[in-house]
Amino acid sequence: MLLSLLNSARLRPELLILVLMVMIISMFVIPLPTYLVDFLIALNIVLAILVFMGSFYIDRILSFSTFPAVLLITTLFRLALSISTSRLILIEADAGEIIATFGQFVIGDSLAVGFVVFSIVTVVQFIVITKGSERVAEVAARFSLDGMPGKQMSIDADLKAGIIDADAARERRSVLERESQLYGSFDGAMKFIKGDAIAGIIIIFVNFIGGISVGMTRHGMDLSSALSTYTMLTIGDGLVAQIPALLIAISAGFIVTRVNGDSDNMGRNIMTQLLNNPFVLVVTAILTISMGTLPGFPLPVFVILSVVLSVLFYFKFREAKRSAAKPKTSKGEQPLSIEEKEGSSLGLIGDLDKVSTETVPLILLVPKSRREDLEKAQLAERLRSQFFIDYGVRLPEVLLRDGEGLDDNSIVLLINEIRVEQFTVYFDLMRVVNYSDEVVSFGINPTIHQQGSSQYFWVTHEEGEKLRELGYVLRNALDELYHCLAVTLARNVNEYFGIQETKHMLDQLEAKFPDLLKEVLRHATVQRISEVLQRLLSERVSVRNMKLIMEALALWAPREKDVINLVEHIRGAMARYICHKFANGGELRAVMVSAEVEDVIRKGIRQTSGSTFLSLDPEASANLMDLITLKLDDLLIAHKDLVLLTSVDVRRFIKKMIEGRFPDLEVLSFGEIADSKSVNVIKTI
């Protein structure tokens, strides 16, 4: 029979809860014998211990999502049990062995001591634990519900960007909904504990006052006997109810104060974080032994505690020293263990399964003789800071490495460990940006460096100051190096700036402009936004004003499906900022593309279902480039701030065609000219 019942309970565990609820309701009405009350009291204590241990060892809050319902059931069970014990105390002056034992154990030989101990337990539960847990639950529920729309938008954005699939999005939404419901339930469930504590206090006074009255009138006891008997039973009954209630209250405190994201159980997290810092341990050990030397303090006790802390410090210090001794890469990963065998160029990688497949985004190879000076000058930090100011993008960590075989004036840029560009920078000289042949007439013989089709002129610092007074623009070596690196990094932005980085920028924007971002994401995926930003950056247009870009996207993304045309519309919206970047004061010096040249470009534009591209025959393309080169070469030497001005429909094609020969020449459309800027057309091609 017993085995059959246990098997039924195993197959349908919900029957146990159903039986328990029926029993609880019956206890409110039906008188129970003392032996059954003892069993139910023991069951109450066991359930409280079970809930306590379960809450302590959960790895996340949703692992115990039924806790609010458990609170309701255990609270009802304790109240029903208190009613049954009160009935026995008042009618029979006997509530079973457990209550009598608890009362005798706590009271001992003194009623006053018993009352004080019981009062302390009640105060601790009601004022400290219950009130604190209730407040934490209220705040957690409020923040969880307030943050739900933002989390929902984040899931939708990840789904649109292709970072997660539909199943993963569905699972995340389910978890988010369950968390919100759980925190909302906690806010109300904590009232069960508070109400239970108040009811327990009232029941104690009823048992004490009513018991003495019933004992003297019904059982014929004198005042002394009634006081002794009913005090013992009242305190015993109160403790039997309050101790399980205290365990449940502590369990609730454990759960509501747990931080989501901690992977281990609470005990492990507490010990790991409390004893993680060796410095804290050794200082605490010293303070502990110092306290033991105070007059009247038991020195052996403090010595033992100090020794325990010192032992913990020793193990933690040894562990930290061992970890520090292991060489690490810049990202904190273990370096590859590569052994080259004699006669073979093949390398052997130790523990291949733990090797990251990531490449290093940005590396600068610098001359060995210059590396220390460049590190002192904080080249990497300055590059990242200034690039963010100029372009609005946070560069990945920039690593400086010794460049084998580099001369003292060469710098090599690697993007994702692939060589992109080599720059020549004379660190002891200054570069003349707007050089002209007039410089020679001042008795200055510049150092000339030819890089590609461009010439760079360098002079000494004394000569540079003289030229600056005459109106020439000069850059020191670090500024010139930054300029060269920034142009190359902007041109290759798609190598290190993509969907994930775009998502990070959008998350920051969401905190200030959630409605704007929501409107943009209705019509543009994160991938599409990422491509727009890449195209802007590749032409040296800053994306720091993300609000303006998002406003333009919200306006044009529903109408324009082609990303290239969409970028042109956004550039038009950013006209004031683009003109400010490339204009000389209030004037924009420009070389205008003639209508004849634009017509040649238009005739070569080909459109497919996937993209639009320029397809000129080789002869026409060569003739056009020769014409542009002839017109621009001399002008660009005399005017470094020139831009090429053309119609919006051919702008991007002209830019693509000339960027190999004139990488620093900006091509603007008429729609990108701000009203506040005047245009000085120097020449027409």
UniProtKB/Swiss-Prot annotation:
It is found in: Cell inner membrane. Keywords: Cell inner membrane, Cell membrane, Membrane, Protein transport, Transmembrane, Transmembrane helix, Transport, Virulence. The keyword Transmembrane helix applies. Changing S369N: In strain: RKS3013, RKS3014 and RKS3015. The chain crosses the membrane at residues 17-37, 39-59, 61-81, 110-130, 197-217, 235-255, 274-294, 295-315. It is a multi-pass membrane protein. Changing S306A: In strain: RKS3013, RKS3014 and RKS3015. Changing R475Q: In strain: RKS3013, RKS3014 and RKS3015. GO terms for biological process: protein secretion. InterPro entries: FHIPEP_1, FHIPEP_3, FHIPEP_4, FHIPEP_CS, T3SS_FHIPEP, T3SS_HrcV. One of its GO terms (cellular component) is plasma membrane. Changing S263T: In strain: SR-11, RKS2985, RKS2993, RKS2995, RKS3013, RKS3014, RKS3015, RKS3057, RKS3333 and RKS4194. Changing D407S: In strain: RKS3013, RKS3014 and RKS3015. Disulfide bonds: none annotated. Changing V440A: In strain: RKS2985, RKS2993, RKS2995, RKS3013, RKS3014, RKS3015 and RKS3057. Belongs to the FHIPEP (flagella/HR/invasion proteins export pore) family. Involved in the invasion of the cells of the intestinal epithelium. Could be involved in the translocation of the InvE protein. This is Invasion protein InvA. The lineage of its organism: Bacteria, Pseudomonadati, Pseudomonadota, Gammaproteobacteria, Enterobacterales.
